[in-house]
């Protein structure tokens, strides 16, 4: 940029205005005066009264204004903390706040590593956050913590390393002039996490002006130093552009078409819980789109290439953010692909491109390597040469055996894969089950859209949306990037929606090569550990990969679930919720608890259920299931192609015993889809092409049905002999006007096409079957389902 001419308003008294001119570098007089002219107009306008100055009295009131920070209970529930409870006005050890021998009446007591989201009051006069921080005197040993105050895209202030006994360090953070609506208070451990009792004290909002920026202008990433086609880290430049968007209150971020590289070193280190993943303390976020409103990111067909263990994209605490025409990939994919060159009854010989997939052989075992990481092998998936289909009847192949280098790129594995039907030319995807980071996270966001966004790789879910409202994905999807020669994409689900509400729309996208579902929609329920009194429950996050995120907030309704039967037991309103640690919570409700609630039951959020439209997508060549839905709001699955998804194409689930993923389906329409040779392998809950499989411990005790109102109509099934429909605890189930064309491309299961376990009001009619046949009750397997509950026609 030619010259850097910046002005800051230092003082306003009546009509006197002083500007500080900083950093005037060599530039022509012409350029200098052209810039100064616009500022001269602003000054003249102020003097002329176009921008009225404050009166001295008004100015004095504004300068002296202070608002004590009232930390909402929701911020404590949203806090990620490595251990223990976050406390208001108390230390981590539940004593008074004290730093460097000085006592403080107000603040937050936490334990590093932690990150506290702090919303800014909706007041245009709030300009700064002031406060102090340090290690609490009550810690039993010498801790070491670095405190940071962050916006949604950059570190605004850092304390440096602090230790017990040091005086509190003060900070003053510009807020309004940066367009900030959320701040993030992070305490990060330095040496280890021993005695890292971290206090934030004397927090106050200072009210000295409005500091509002212009609205809606275009921000060009190139003006902030983003350069395509070089291997330099583009993260800092992009984050500076995002900060500019926030300052001006929204607008368009324009990224010139090109290839851009991102590394952990230039990422914004944040700490928060992500549903259905491992829980690393730090998520290095390369593209943080946090605390934004009314922002459109135009990628113009660019490719973002990421290196190392990072979160590529984050949309958090934002509203009306759209990302358009962008591709996301890792330079080193998270799985390693090996091409089979020879098989026999004892060994399998493969070739691995070591440049694309770095590895070492240690103690005759694989050690796969990437930037900043090493991992072993746990299992593999086998993909067929030419078609890219997962090879039939292979499912997950567990192995971590003897590896012998043969020279060049060839290796011999002590592994008989011939017996699995694997042939030379097929591809083995060598993997494990680690899920450190998703490819894209949407968290506490409203009205988010991805348009023609392609996610090519991820170690966990490609897209994870949690605690958010209204999401739209159109075009793009999760697919192999052309030219890479790969067959796999996401390490788990392509898209995953946990505890969301409003509407989810996913349409015209391609999903292929992922290690789990194309889409998975569910709530998370917590296990009831103890009924403390008539209004209070102790609850627990029950799966180690689904902990810590805010399932309930005060004012929201919870629904009780009978643990053994999954039957609903009424609702209540949350009065208070205290997170004791990342896995345990104490909930107090306004109304008396139902007398039937007891330990072993579960609770879910009755205010966070989404409707779903999954329409005109292609799902192919993936592990496990094509799609999974668990929500009582309307679900429409229409016009999709499910092509060789190796498990069920569609699963309706629900449980309170494993993942604790709940949300009984009350209206599901499955129509105008095409199903081609699904169920070539078997996985959990995949009992038919369409499998309705809630996990009910005591099905015979149920008085009601878990799922209801499922309509399956006008679909085409091109399939070998496998069950078409399996259902447990479902009422009002219709399979009508479908076309089923059988083939012999794979070995059939030899089972009945319809299987029902404690179901009611089933209608099967007007279906066309080739070769021709007429279905009768003989084609149904019935368990705890009276025969008069199944009708054919009428």
From Swiss-Prot:
Enzyme class, broadest EC rank: hydrolase
Cross-referenced Gene3D superfamilies: NPCBM/NEW2 domain, Single-stranded right-handed beta-helix, Pectin lyase-like
Keywords: Glycosidase, Hydrolase, Repeat, Signal
Catalytic activity: Hydrolysis of terminal, non-reducing branched (1->3)-alpha-D-galactosidic residues, producing free D-galactose; Hydrolysis of terminal, non-reducing linear (1->3)-alpha-D-galactosidic residues, producing free D-galactose; Hydrolysis of terminal, non-reducing alpha-D-galactose residues in alpha-D-galactosides, including galactose oligosaccharides, galactomannans and galactolipids
Signal peptide residue numbers: 1-57
Origin: domain of life: Bacteria
Described purpose of this protein according to its UniProt entry: Alpha-galactosidase. Removes both branched alpha-1,3-linked galactose residues of blood group B antigens and linear alpha-1,3-linked galactose structures.
Protein's name according to its UniProt entry: Alpha-1,3-galactosidase B
Source organism of this protein record: Akkermansia muciniphila (strain ATCC BAA-835 / DSM 22959 / JCM 33894 / BCRC 81048 / CCUG 64013 / CIP 107961 / Muc)
